[in-house]
Amino acid sequence: MGKPPRAMTPVEEVDLSAVRYQSPSLQAPHLTGFSLRAFVWLMESPLFGRLLTSVLKSQNNITRMLQDTVIPERPMYLPEYPPQEPEQGVLLLGDDRDPVDRVEEALHCLPPYDPSLRWPAGDKPPFLYWKIRDFAHAYRSGITTPSVVAEHIIAGVEEWSNKKPPMPMLVYFNADDLRKQAEASTKRFQQGNPISILDGIFIAIKDDIDCFPYPSKGATTFFDKIRSVEKDAVCVARLRKCGVLFIGKANMHELGLGVTGNNPNYGTARNPHSIDRYTGGSSSGPAALVSSGLCSAAIGTDGGGSVRIPSSLCGIIGLKTTYGRTDMTGALCDCGTVEVASPLAASVEDALLVYSAIAGSRPMDKLTLRPSPLCVPNLVSPDNNNILGSVKIGKYTEWFHDVSDRDISNTCEDALNLLCSSFGCQIEEIILPELEEMRTAHVVSIGTESFCDLNPHYRAGKRTEFTLDTRTSLALFGSFTSTDYVASQRIRRRIMYYHNEAFKKVDVIATPTTGITAPEIPQSSLKLGESNYVVSAYLMRFVIAGNLLGLPAITVPVGHDKQGLPIGLQLIGRPWGEASLLRVASAIEELCLKKRKRPSAFHDILNA
């Protein structure tokens, strides 16, 4: 007789005091160049592929977790949230209201704009990113126009595209179209009729979100030939209605199936803080564009940290919204269970304004997910500091410090301590069991859903047109079985229970955003790509709950490591708790403002 299967304790009976944190130990080869090509041939081979994927899954406990374990919980195929208490000190925006009206309402939640603080006379001020309200002030006061700023952007894009090495932030850029958009905005200002505070604001769109008339390729070489773009994605249409100007389609890790940003098709986006290092991904181009100063904000997608990871590595803000808070209609992946469209921005204030414009659930999500009312924090409320002082921050210390270099966790801890000493917040120790099971369930969930979307094209002869690292991922994803998928959804229910229990004690959960700072780009990866699951696991270590459970999360820059590379602190919130995250993130941003550094590759488009 065989050995009886492992059985997990029912989730309600798990003794948290007996839980011991185990640092993950991922086993997979690091491959570039010819070795990557050979590995892909083996993975796709009918003779060797099944054996190789079986070994990889066995070595990384995937088979044991999903095939050899009895999991007593029911599957959770979509995030399921209990009713949430109303957030304090917020302004309701209304899910179905016009985005222009919502942005106008959100504007009243921000401190009054003082040009003297943003445009000081005399000595050169410390480095600050220009904010959306700085551009609005410059346009309204006649300092500059959207057309002038557009020319600075065009010059910056051309300059960095011709650098050695080049910095390919965009996969589609049309200077004439940008000039046309800017001219229309300039006329509105000349006539005294700007549409909103976002009129004339330049924003980039990740290449897996439709922005008419540009194609959506997902940074492949072929997707625009099999899928046409007839109109804007919903989130883009909402921004366009506010007067936003779109600078083009931003580079990304091909089809979002990686978190470094490597892309041999269009060139790998480079980190503005150190051009020999990755931006992180998959929203690599959006992060590089915002970090380098070429736009105030960008829209990316986040299915496995793809907004938060590059935002952290590039030293900017990345907000991942609750699953179902933003309408994914018009994105290449608009029917998965882990992905959302969300903003990257130079400041929390700008993230708040862009979020106010794009938020709003689609009708089906309103029926199934029952989102809490859409709101933003009232940062000028007399109670704002008191609300901040009442915040309880959850911290799983052993997990928090499981990073490649203690510079990362110590810097994040310093930011939390500064927040607590400034406002009176409390840090509470929490325990989150089964983090490795969570990682496995996420890999199987996003992998199976991606493979389901791409397999028809794969089988129709497009296999060799994918990059090698995408083909590696698809070969692994295609080996997952229905049993693996259902078992992963059972794990999803367990992990949701643990987080719901933690949120009975705390308001937000704090972690470093990534387990490493920006990794170096191997020269050998530029032509054929790279497969490095160990580095990817470090980058994704803390972000997965946001996707598997659909929870909102935000990353805020809080300092740099010894090499001068940005470090991000992540805050994970309750379902639909974006307002609370934005409030706490705004306070942390202000406390750490002097620690931000001008990227070595930076273009001042407002004061060029």
UniProtKB/Swiss-Prot annotation:
This protein's record includes keyword ATP-binding: no
Biological process, per Gene Ontology: lipid catabolic process; N-acylethanolamine metabolic process
Pfam family, one: Amidase
Source organism, top-level taxon: Eukaryota
Coiled-coil features, chain-numbered ranges: none
Active site: 206, 282, 306
Enzyme class at the top of the EC tree: hydrolase
EC number: 3.5.1.-
Any one GO CC term of the record: endoplasmic reticulum membrane
Residues involved in substrate binding: 303-306
Record localization: Endoplasmic reticulum membrane; Cell membrane
PROSITE patterns: AMIDASES
Keywords annotated in UniProt: Cell membrane, Endoplasmic reticulum, Hydrolase, Lipid degradation, Lipid metabolism, Membrane
Gene Ontology molecular function, alphabetical: N-(long-chain-acyl)ethanolamine deacylase activity
Regulation: Inhibited by methyl arachidonyl fluorophosphonate (MAFP).
Keyword Membrane: yes
Gene3D superfamilies: Amidase signature (AS) domain
Protein purpose: Catalyzes the hydrolysis of bioactive endogenous fatty acid amides to their corresponding acids. The hydrolysis of endogenous amidated lipids terminates their participation as lipid mediators in various signaling systems. Converts a wide range of N-acylethanolamines (NAEs) to their corresponding free fatty acids and ethanolamine.
Family: Belongs to the amidase family.
Protein name stated in the entry: Fatty acid amide hydrolase
Organism: Oryza sativa subsp. indica (Rice)
Gene behind the chain: FAAH
